[in-house]
Design a protein with these regions (language model features):
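Catalytic-site microenvironment of enzymes
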Residues: 1-242
Length: 242
C-alpha cells in the first residue's frame, strides 16, 4: 500500500511539472506583439519647432492640424482617430497588445513625442495613420512612407520599416480596392526619424479627391482601411519568421 501511495505521489509530481512546462511553453509562444498606433495630427497645431531627428539642426513644426475633406469637411485628425480606434479593436481581437499615442483629438503631442511613446513601449511595429491632399483633385490612391536606407538617424531599422510599409500598403489596397501608389522613402518625417522601432506612415487616400473623400467619411470604408492595415501587420510578422 505504501509503495502504491509513493508511486501515486511521484506520478502526481510529474504531471504537475509537465503541466507547468506546458504552461510556460504556451506563454512564450503566445507572447503578444506590441503595436503602437499614432492617429496623425490633432485639433490644434503646435507650430513650435523641434529637430527632425536626434541631434539634427534642421527643424520642423512639432505637429500640424492636417488637411480636411473638400466635400465632406471631415478633418484629417478626426478621420485618423476613427480609423485608429477601429484598428485598435481589430488588433486586440487578433491577440496583439496595442498602445495608442492618443485617444482624443484635443491633445498636444509632438511628432517626436509620439515616436517616444512607441520607443518606450518597445513596440514591434509603429503605425502612423494619415490622409493625403494634393493640388489636383484627380490624384487618388493609398501610399505608405518609411525612411531611406541611408537615414542618418535610424538606418538600422530601414529594412523592417520598408517591409512593414510594403505589407501594410498591400493589405490596405487589397481590402479597400483603392488605387495602389507606392512606398515613399524619405528622411524628412520627424515621427519616423525619432523612431527606434519599425515604423510606417499610412496615407489612406486623398481628401482632395471627391471619391476618396466621400469614401473615407463612411464607417464601412474606414473599417476596410483598418482591416487592411491589420492584415498587413499580420503578413509583416509572418514574413519575419521565414
Amino acid at each position: 500500500m505504501k509503495k502504491l501511495l509513493s508511486m501515486f505521489l511521484v506520478l502526481a509530481m510529474l504531471v504537475t511539472i509537465c503541466s507547468d512546462n506546458i504552461y510556460i511553453a504556451n506563454a512564450a509562444t503566445n507572447k503578444k506583439k506590441v503595436i503602437c498606433i499614432d492617429a496623425g495630427h490633432q485639433t490644434k497645431a503646435n507650430l513650435e519647432k523641434e529637430p527632425i531627428g536626434p541631434g539634427a539642426k534642421t527643424t520642423k513644426f512639432k505637429v500640424t492640424g492636417g488637411t480636411s475633406g473638400l466635400w465632406t469637411k471631415q478633418t484629417e485628425y478626426a478621420l485618423a482617430l476613427k480609423v485608429a480606434k477601429k484598428l485598435q479593436k481589430i488588433l486586440k481581437k487578433r491577440g496583439y497588445k496595442v498602445i495608442m499615442c492618443r485617444t482624443k483629438n484635443d491633445v498636444n503631442i509632438s511628432n517626436s513625442e509620439r515616436a517616444a511613446i512607441a520607443n518606450k513601449a518597445k513596440a514591434d511595429a509603429f503605425i502612423r495613420i494619415h490622409a493625403n491632399g494634393a493640388a489636383s483633385k484627380a490624384v487618388n490612391g493609398a501610399m505608405t512612407i518609411c525612411q531611406t536606407k541611408k537615414n542618418p538617424f535610424n538606418s538600422d531599422i530601414y529594412s523592417n520599416s520598408k517591409l512593414l510599409s510594403e505589407k501594410v500598403l498591400d493589405g490596405v489596397v487589397d481590402k479597400s480596392g483603392c488605387k495602389k501608389l507606392y512606398v515613399w522613402e524619405t528622411d524628412t518625417m520627424s515621427g519616423i526619424n525619432w523612431s527606434k522601432v519599425p515604423v510606417t506612415i499610412v496615407e489612406m487616400g486623398y481628401m482632395t479627391n471627391e471619391k476618396e473623400d466621400r469614401a473615407l467619411n463612411t464607417a464601412s470604408y474606414q473599417k476596410k482601411m483598418a482591416e487592411g492595415m491589420a492584415d498587413g501587420i499580420d503578413e509583416y510578422f509572418k514574413e519575419l519568421k521565414k
